[in-house]
């Protein structure tokens, strides 16, 4: 397979540098399962239908650890698992209705946020220190809000 030349390498490419299809598929599956597990850490809020969950941290960590391409694909797999009805979303829920509901914008932004954090790691090495990691995570979180909040507002108004 073709090798990528990146200024920095994400954690998984350092730990497991040999790139094969089976490795990539396994990392995508593990990444999606990690986010599914972190989604079960949920704190419902009385004033909004969107709970605070651990899955946001999971999304950002998957992006940082797997890189832009595998991070994006892992979160795309996560959305497909949930759309098929597997109980991977917050509160052990799944289904297309969840994606079309108030949390849908946040869910749809997950692959983008993981891809962005992975890109920041690959291009600028922002996972090499505390402040770089903080910046990458804040930018990924900002992207989640940029997509998720307008969706939530439209859902609440409509």
Describe the predicted segments one by one.
Residues 86-92, 150-158:
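Interfacial helix-loop-helix junctions of multi-pass membrane proteins
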Residues 39, 43, 81, 117, ...:
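Membrane-water interface at transmembrane helix exits
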Residues 2-72:
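Hydrophobic transmembrane alpha-helices
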Residues 40-51, 79-113:
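Interfacial aromatic-anchored transmembrane helix boundaries in multi-pass membrane proteins
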Residues 25-30, 57-61, 71-77, 103, ...:
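Hydrophobic alpha-helical transmembrane segments
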Residues 32-35, 78-82, 114, 141:
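Residue-level recognition of pore/gate-forming positions within transmembrane alpha-helices
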Residues 132-133, 144-156:
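Strongly charged, low-complexity linkers/loops
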Residues 2-17, 23, 37, 96-144:
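Short helix-perturbing small/polar motifs within transmembrane alpha-helices
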